Structures are given as structure tokens and as C-alpha cells.
Regions:
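A general structural-boundary detector
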Residues: 14, 43, 67, 140, ...
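Conserved catalytic-core segment of NTP-binding enzymes
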Residues: 46-151
Length: 206
């Protein structure tokens, strides 16, 4: 079954207020159109802070933030003291997530917001000092800015190979894929299953 794609472009109207109203309506209409016919909706937003991205965030039930295993990428979440790994201040993105949570609560007139999860991406196969330091920093950060850590993905060639064919590791049992499973593939598929289980979608990976 192929997913339904619905691209949403930012409004080109000159008036900021009118453009924002148009963008908000475009996202709302897309969600309303897709929801009755689909079990899940994935909203992929750019890495920049703009109004359309904020609206997309506000419709989240689960917000997934992938993070390369690097202190350079950790700046996306917060500024960190290099000695203690304690947060010195939240990043613009973390502040945006907090603001969007409030926006969602106001729109839905409830205290319900969304589950913000951070997954480490392209981690090394062998444990390193950097990995341990990242783990410590993220553990301290999670309680400060309100996310939880979920299992991430290791650096694996199979992810890049399957991308070129438009496949995921969950497609490998499908007839016609012609890919022989090995232990590395099985380990990678388990990583996907662990992530899905962590966000409550484990039934879909059986």
C-alpha cells in the first residue's frame, strides 16, 4: 500500500496575516481530508523555524526529533556546559516546541499537547566516550525541556541502500524485493521495531 502524499507550500500572499491564515487553513484542511482514510499521518517539516512548520508541529500527537550523535547537533536542543553537560539555556527550537505545545492546548481547549521524543541517529556500532557523554547530556536535558529519549538507529549501509529503492526494513519480507536477509539486516530491523514500540506503533511491525 503506497502512502498518500500531500505537499503544502507556504502562501505567497504579500500580507503576513493573510499568508499565515492561508497556511493554517492549508494544514488543517490536509489533516481533515486525510484523517478519515488513514491510520497515521506523518507531517515532515523543514529544519527551519517558520509559521507553516509551527502549524505542522501543532497537529502532532508525537513529535520525533532525530539527532545525530554529535554535540554539534545537540545545539538544536540547548546550549550545554562542556564540563558538566548541564543546560545553560534552551535553543530556539526547544523554545518553539514549548510555544507550539501551548498553541495546540489553546486550539483544542485542553491540557493535552503532544509526546516529544528524541532519537539518536547514525550512532556508532562500538561504544565510545562521545556516546557516553551524549547519553549523559541528553538524560539531563530530557527533564529540563520536556522530551523523552527513544531507541535510535545505528550507522548502517542497509538504510542508505533501501532508500534508493524506496523501501524500508519492514518491506524485506515482501515478495519481489530480492534482498537476502543477514544478521546485520535483522539487527537493523530490530532497531526499527524498537523505535516503533517506543512510540506505540509496535503492532504495525509484526
Amino acid at each position: 500500500v503506497m502512502p498518500t502524499h500531500r505537499p503544502i507550500e507556504p502562501s505567497s500572499v504579500a500580507s503576513i496575516d493573510v499568508a499565515r491564515a492561508h497556511d493554517a487553513h492549508s494544514v488543517e484542511k490536509a489533516v481533515q481530508d486525510l484523517a478519515p482514510r488513514h491510520d497515521y499521518i506523518v507531517i515532515d517539516t523543514p529544519g527551519t523555524d517558520n509559521f507553516l512548520s509551527r502549524v505542522g508541529h501543532s497537529y502532532s500527537d508525537t513529535l520525533i526529533t532525530p539527532l545525530n550523535d554529535s554535540f554539534i547537533d545537540l545545539d538544536v536542543l540547548a546550549m550545554i556546559d562542556p564540563e558538566t553537560y548541564a543546560m545553560t539555556r534552551p535553543s530556539k527550537y526547544a523554545e518553539m516546541v514549548f510555544q507550539v505545545k501551548m498553541q495546540k492546548a489553546r486550539r483544542e481547549k485542553s491540557n493535552r499537547t503532544f509526546d516529544w521524543v528524541v532519537m539518536r541517529n547514525r550512532t556508532g556500532q562500538l561504544e565510545s566516550r562521545n556516546q557516553r557523554s551524549m547519553e549523559e547530556a541528553l538524560t539531563k536535558l530530557s527533564s529540563r525541556i520536556g522530551f523523552r529519549q527513544v531507541p535510535g538507529f545505528s550507522e548502517r549501509v542497509i538504510f542508505r541502500e533501501l532508500f534508493l529503492d524506496g523501501l524500508t526494513l519492514l518491506d524485506l519480507k515482501t515478495p519481489g524485493t530480492d534482498i537476502r536477509m543477514n544478521m546485520s539486516h535483522l539487527s537493523a530491523r530490530q532497531e526499527v521495531r524498537d523505535l516503533m514500540a517506543a512510540i506505540g506503533l509496535d503492532r504495525e511491525t509484526q
